[in-house]
Amino acid sequence: MEVVAEGVETPDCLAWLRQAGCDTVQGFLFARPMPAAAFVGFVNQWRNTTMNANEPSTSCCVCCKEIPLDAAFTPEGAEYVEHFCGLECYQRFQARASTATETSVKPDACDSPPSG
């Protein structure tokens, strides 16, 4: 049986569900409610990103700009970012975290170059 959890809002909740054996999750941690007209574009962005994750022309920011910084550093978040966008994108999150720590400001993931 496949288990789906709805209403996942925090990285802690996501970690608990993963430990409990939950197969799939959805919730505000990944996307907020949106108008129907915006949904088509949202789905197309995800589909294109998933299909083109290894192409250099695909911007990591297409799929992960909505991921909160703290969510990107959970085991699940890291796995998600690396799966859909690759290691370079995860390195952008690391650079973003470093910048946020140094300045106490959370810049957009797109603003920071990959580290390394």
Swiss-Prot record:
PANTHER family: CYCLIC DI-GMP PHOSPHODIESTERASE PDED-RELATED, CYCLIC DI-GMP PHOSPHODIESTERASE PDEF
Protein name, entry field: Transposon Tn21 modulator protein
One Pfam family linked to the record: DUF3330
SUPFAM superfamilies, alphabetized: EAL domain-like
Free-text function comment from the UniProt entry: This protein enhances the Tn21 transposition by activating expression of the transposase gene and decreases the resolution of the cointegrated DNA by suppressing expression of the resolvase gene.
Alphabetically ordered keywords of this record: Activator, Repressor, Transcription, Transcription regulation, Transposable element
Molecular-function GO term, any one: cyclic-guanylate-specific phosphodiesterase activity
Keyword Transcription: yes
Source species: Escherichia coli
Domain EAL: 1-47
Stretches of the chain forming a coiled coil according to its record: none
